[in-house]
C-alpha cells in the first residue's frame, strides 16, 4: 500500500511539473523547448562573459603563435573577442575532458566551441519555444518562421562555414573587431560581394529597414486624433481598443499619390505580411549563400573580362575588387602561409622542360 501511494505521489509531482512547464499563465512561458533553452543559453552566456574578461591567448592558427582576445590580456571592448578554436583541433569535438588539462583546453580555444554549440542549440530551442507558445495560444506559427532567419544566419557562420572549411578556427570570432575581420577575410577568400545571394540579403536588410521606416512614419502621420492639441497623440490610444488607431485610407491615398497608386497597400494584413517576409527571405538567402561559399562555391569572377582589339586588359570594377581581395588575403594569417591560397595553387612550371 505504501509503494502504491508513493508512486501516485511521484506521478502527481510529474503531472504538476508538466502543467507548470506548459502553462500560458506564467509570467514567462517556459515550454518543453525552454527546458533545454534555459541551461544552454545560460551556459553560453556565462562562459562568454568569463572568457571575454579572462581567457588566455589562443593558438588559433595552430602554429604556436597565440592570439590574445580577453580584456585582462590587453584588449578593450572593441578589440576583444572570444578567439575561435585552434586549427590544430579542426572539427573535432573538444570538451574539457578531452584535453590533458584546463590550460591546454584554454590554449586551444575550447571556450569558443563550447559557447557556439550551446548558443546554437539555445537559439534553436528559442525558435521552437516561439512555435510552442503560438500553438498553445491558438496563434499562427509565423513568429517562429520569421525568427528562423537569424537562426539560419548564425548557424551558417558558426557551424556550416567551419564544417565546409574544415576547422572551427575559420568560424566567426565572438567580438566586434573579430566580426569585421571575419567579413574582410570572407570577402578575400570567397568574393561574397559578387554573390547573388549576398545581394539579395542586402536588399532584404536595407529594404526591410526602408519599408519599416516608411510604414511607421505613414502610420504616425495618419493617427486618428483622440486628444487635444496640448496632449500627446499617443495618449489617445488605449491598449486593446477595438477602433482603428490610424486612418489606413488616408495613408494609402498619400502614398499612392507620392509614388503611384499600386505602390500602396490597401489591405493591412497583406501589408504586414510583406513587411515580415521581405527581410526574412533576404536573410534566408544570405545564410544560404554563406553555406554554399563554405564549400567554396564562391561569388562571380569577372576578372580581366574586358579586352581591347589588341588583347590588352581594360580594367573593370571587378578587377579593382580582385586586387583588393588579393591584398586582404595576403595580410591575414600572414605567418601561417607565405602566399595567398589562389596564388600558391598555380601549377609551377617544370625546370627541366
Curated annotation (Swiss-Prot):
One of its GO terms (molecular function) is electron transporter, transferring electrons within the cyclic electron transport pathway of photosynthesis activity. GO terms for cellular component: chloroplast thylakoid membrane; photosystem II. The D1/D2 heterodimer binds P680, chlorophylls that are the primary electron donor of PSII, and subsequent electron acceptors. It shares a non-heme iron and each subunit binds pheophytin, quinone, additional chlorophylls, carotenoids and lipids. D1 provides most of the ligands for the Mn4-Ca-O5 cluster of the oxygen-evolving complex (OEC). There is also a Cl(-1) ion associated with D1 and D2, which is required for oxygen evolution. The PSII complex binds additional chlorophylls, carotenoids and specific lipids. The chain crosses the membrane at residues 29-46, 118-133, 142-156, 197-218, 274-288. Its main location: plastid. InterPro entries: D1/D2 (IPR055266), Photo_II_D1/D2_sf (IPR036854), Photo_RC_L/M (IPR000484), Photo_RC_L/M_CS (IPR055265), PSII_D1 (IPR005867). Fe cation binds at residues 215, 272. Chlorophyll a PD1 binds at residue 198. GO terms for biological process: photosynthetic electron transport in photosystem II; response to herbicide. Pheophytin a binds at residue 126. It catalyses: 2 a plastoquinone + 4 hnu + 2 H2O = 2 a plastoquinol + O2. [CaMn4O5] cluster binds at residues 170, 189, 332-333, 342, 344. The modification Phosphothreonine is found at residue 2. The record marks 190 as: Stabilizes free radical intermediate. Belongs to the reaction center PufL/M/PsbA/D family. PSII is composed of 1 copy each of membrane proteins PsbA, PsbB, PsbC, PsbD, PsbE, PsbF, PsbH, PsbI, PsbJ, PsbK, PsbL, PsbM, PsbT, PsbX, PsbY, PsbZ, Psb30/Ycf12, at least 3 peripheral proteins of the oxygen-evolving complex and a large number of cofactors. It forms dimeric complexes. This is Photosystem II protein D1. It comes from Cucumis sativus (Cucumber). The gene is psbA.
Amino acid at each position: 500500500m505504501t509503494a502504491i501511494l508513493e508512486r501516485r505521489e511521484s506521478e502527481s509531482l510529474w503531472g504538476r511539473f508538466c502543467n507548470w512547464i506548459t502553462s500560458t499563465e506564467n509570467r514567462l512561458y517556459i515550454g518543453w523547448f525552454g527546458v533545454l533553452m534555459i541551461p544552454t543559453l545560460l551556459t553560453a552566456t556565462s562562459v562568454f562573459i568569463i572568457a571575454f574578461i579572462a581567457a588566455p591567448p589562443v593558438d588559433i592558427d595552430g602554429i604556436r603563435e597565440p592570439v590574445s582576445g580577453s580584456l585582462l590580456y590587453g584588449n578593450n571592448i572593441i578589440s576583444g573577442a572570444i578567439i575561435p578554436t585552434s586549427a590544430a583541433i579542426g572539427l573535432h569535438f573538444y570538451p574539457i575532458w578531452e584535453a590533458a588539462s584546463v590550460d591546454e583546453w584554454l590554449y586551444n580555444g575550447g571556450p569558443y566551441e563550447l559557447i557556439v554549440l550551446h548558443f546554437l542549440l539555445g537559439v534553436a530551442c528559442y525558435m521552437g519555444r516561439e512555435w510552442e507558445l503560438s500553438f498553445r495560444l491558438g496563434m499562427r506559427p509565423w513568429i517562429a518562421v520569421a525568427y528562423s532567419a537569424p537562426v539560419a544566419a548564425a548557424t551558417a557562420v558558426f557551424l556550416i562555414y567551419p564544417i565546409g572549411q574544415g576547422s572551427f578556427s575559420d568560424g566567426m570570432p565572438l567580438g566586434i573587431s573579430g566580426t569585421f575581420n571575419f567579413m574582410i577575410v570572407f570577402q578575400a577568400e570567397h568574393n561574397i560581394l559578387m554573390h547573388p545571394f549576398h545581394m539579395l540579403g542586402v536588399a532584404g536588410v536595407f529594404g526591410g529597414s526602408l519599408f519599416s521606416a516608411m510604414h511607421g512614419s505613414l502610420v504616425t502621420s495618419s493617427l486618428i486624433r483622440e486628444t487635444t492639441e496640448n496632449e500627446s497623440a499617443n495618449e489617445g490610444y488605449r491598449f486593446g481598443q477595438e477602433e482603428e488607431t490610424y486612418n489606413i485610407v488616408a495613408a494609402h491615398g498619400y502614398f499612392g499619390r507620392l509614388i503611384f497608386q499600386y505602390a500602396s497597400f490597401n489591405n493591412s494584413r497583406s501589408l504586414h505580411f510583406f513587411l515580415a517576409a521581405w527581410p526574412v527571405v533576404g536573410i534566408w538567402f544570405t545564410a544560404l549563400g554563406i553555406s554554399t561559399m563554405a564549400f567554396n562555391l564562391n561569388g562571380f569572377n569577372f576578372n580581366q573580362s574586358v579586352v581591347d582589339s589588341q588583347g590588352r586588359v581594360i580594367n573593370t570594377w571587378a578587377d579593382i575588387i580582385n586586387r583588393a581581395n588579393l591584398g586582404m588575403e595576403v595580410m591575414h594569417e600572414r605567418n601561417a602561409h607565405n602566399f595567398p591560397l589562389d596564388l600558391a595553387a598555380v601549377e609551377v612550371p617544370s625546370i627541366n622542360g
